[in-house]
Amino acid sequence: MAFDTKLLEIIACPVCKGKLRFDKENSELISTAAKLAYPVIDDIPVLLENEARELSLDEVQKWNS
């Protein structure tokens, strides 16, 4: 089973409450507003700030383009 992208319509970044985008290649949910990437483990998003990694400036720019 794969991550259900329909979830993106109802979940939000827990830090900034903004929209999340799915990075299929890295299996992460991306919040450019909070500059965080949340892992998706076994098709389950882990929306905990302490589990997220910080996005680099280059990554933020990539996702915003």
Swiss-Prot record:
InterPro entries: Trm112-like. Disulfide bonds: none annotated. Pfam families: Trm112p (PF03966). SUPFAM superfamilies: Trm112p-like. GO terms for cellular component: cytosol. Belongs to the UPF0434 family. PANTHER family: PROTEIN PREY, MITOCHONDRIAL, ZGC:162634. This is UPF0434 protein PSHAa1659.
